[in-house]
Amino acid sequence: MDDGFLTSIGNGRTIALMLKLRDGPCIMKDLKEIVLNFQSLKIRLNEMEKDGLVNVTTSLDGHKYVVVELTDLGREIAMLFSITNMAVSPNKNISEKSIDMKHFDTVVRLLRGKEYMVQREIVKNIKTFDTVIRVLDAMESDGLVIKEEVHEGVRQIRYSLTPLGEQIADVFESVHQKMMAV
C-alpha cells in the first residue's frame, strides 16, 4: 500500500483527541483519559504533529508541562469530524463508534466509490485480519456498510458502503487530501 495513503487519522482514538482539542488547548496529561498509555499518547501526538494537525509545546510556568493545541488545519479537520461524529450513531459515545477505531480511515477510503469489496482484498491492504473484522463489524453496527455473503463457486464476503457510509468516506477522503496538501 502507498505510504501516502496512511496518516495519523488511521490510528485509533485520533478523532477523539481532535474533538477534545477542538474546545481549546489541553495539557498533555489531560488527554490520558482518551489514550490511557502515556507512551502511546506521546507517539500519537508526535504523528499528529508531523501531519500538521497539532502543535505540542513545553511550558515552564513554574512547573514543566506539555501543551497540545490544534493547528489551523487541525481545527478545520476537527470541525469536519465533529459533524461526522454527530451523523454516525448519535446515541453512542465516540469511543464506541467505528469512526474512531484504528484502520477505519483506511477501510472506509478503500471501500469509497466501489460497488463492493471482498473481505480478503481489504485484509490484504491492512494485514491484520482480526482488526479488519472488528472495524467492519463496528461499521455495520453504525450503519456504514452492508455485509453480504455470496456463493458464486467460491464463498465471498462482500462489503459495500451505505449512503451514509459514502458520505463519511467522502469526509475522510477530503481530510486526507487536506493533509496531503500540507
What residue spans do the PLM features occupy?
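Short amphipathic alpha-helical interaction segments
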Residues: 36-50, 126-142, 147
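Basic, amphipathic "hinge/linker" alpha-helix immediately C-terminal to the N-terminal HTH DNA-binding motif
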Residues: 63-81, 158-172
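Short acidic, hydrophobic short linear motifs in intrinsically disordered regions
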Residues: 24-34, 115-125
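Short helix-to-turn junction characteristic of helix-turn-helix DNA-binding domains
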Residues: 9, 18-24, 110-114
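Short glycine/proline-centered loop/turn elements that form peptide/ligand docking sites
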Residues: 6-11, 40, 96-101, 131-134, ...
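Short alpha-helical segments that sit at the start of domains
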Residues: 1-15, 80-108
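Short, Lys/Arg-rich nucleic-acid/phosphate-binding segment
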Residues: 58-67, 101, 149-159
